[in-house]
Amino acid sequence: MPNPNLEAVERCQPADNIDVVKICGLLPYEIAREVAKADCVVICCHRTRYTAGLTTVVEALALGLPIICSRNPQIPVDFDRLGCGISVEYGDVEGWQRAVEYIASHPEEARKMGCRGRELAERMFNDERCAKEVAEVIKEISL
C-alpha cells in the first residue's frame, strides 16, 4: 500500500548536513542507537484512527530531540503549540520539505524544541505516571 507521506519525504532533496535513515523491522537496540545520534526525528504516517508513531514520539521526547510528525489527531501531543516540534498535514510535500529545512537551518531553535520535548517527557510520560495509570485501570477492573 503506497504511503504518500513516506513518498513525500523520499522526494525531498535533503541538505548535505541531513542524513535520512529508514529502519524496517524490530531491532530495538540498533534503532535506539541511531535515533540517539539524530538531530531530529521525522515520523511520517498514514492517516489512521489509532496512534501510529506514538512510541517513536515518546522515545524522541525522552531523548530530547525535536520532532517532525504527521498531524495525527490520535497522538496526544500538539508539537507546534508545545514548541517541541513541527506537525505536517498528510500528503503535504511542501510542508514536509519546509519542516526539514527549518530544523536544518535553525539548529539553536531545534535544540530548544528538543529541550522542551524532554521536559514534557519528564512531566507527562514518566514511569511514575504510567504506574499510577496502570494501577487505576487494574483497580477499576477488579471492582
Regions found by a protein language model. Name each.
Residues 8-30:
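Nucleotide-activated donor-binding/catalytic signature segment of Leloir-type glycosyltransferases, i.e.
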Residues 27-39, 62, 80:
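Short acidic alpha-helix that forms the nucleotide-activated donor recognition element
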Residues 98, 102, 109-123, 136:
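A short, well-ordered alpha-helix in the C-terminal region of glycosyltransferases
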Residues 127-143:
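C-terminal alpha-helical cap of glycosyltransferases
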